[in-house]
Amino acid sequence: NYIPKGYEIPSDVDYFHCTSNNTIYGTQMKEFPNSTTLMVCDMSSDIFSRRIDVSRFDIIYAGAQKNMGPAGTTLVIVKDEVLGKTGRNIPTMLDYNTHISKDSMFNTPPVFPIYVSMLTLQWLKNLGGVEVIEKMNQEKADLLYAEIDRNPLFEGTVAKEDRSNMNVCFLLNDSSKEDAFNTLWNAAGISGIKGHRSVGGYRASLYNAMPIESVQVLIDMMKKLEQN
């Protein structure tokens, strides 16, 4: 329920790997460690949701299925100087150089997911880019977290400074009201907010495409449960 802080990355490691946003626990790295070692980051669940200094990382990879398009494609940003430095033999298919040299068409590409990702990025650009969507995502998350903190029936599960803007995880304090709450949000047309099976509770995913109006519907149902 929190992001570790104050740690040092040993200088003799080959690389440091982190995941910028944890979808299961609802934590998100707001700052990244300074290190001279090779930095690798999985940004699958918050890529293009906020501004990031890409130059700080040697490799960034992200599955498309959260903020870019349908599942089946992966975006990779890699610095030229780290290519070919595996120090061991790896399968041709797993070598980034293979895909770079073939313009990402070493094998038959999944055309539809790539096409939809293009449309999504065009939509984001026309919206005003990452800076604009970052503000919109912050507004959505702030609204929902404010209700979680205000409403005595609900409780956040993550340290406030580490709360994710993409995956808002929370608990219902009164288990006797669980059926009533589930009925409310189901009737309101909300789906998929049950928490991950390993942690339970609830999880509202606020990815780029989620409009603020939908977040407000969930908040209204939380208030309605309180009134009942």
Please describe what each predicted stretch is.
Residues 78, 170-174, 206-208:
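Short beta-strand-to-loop capping motifs
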Residues 187, 196, 200-228:
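PLP-dependent enzyme catalytic core of the Aspartate aminotransferase-like
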Residues 2-5, 26-31, 49-55, 71-74, ...:
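A short secondary-structure junction signal
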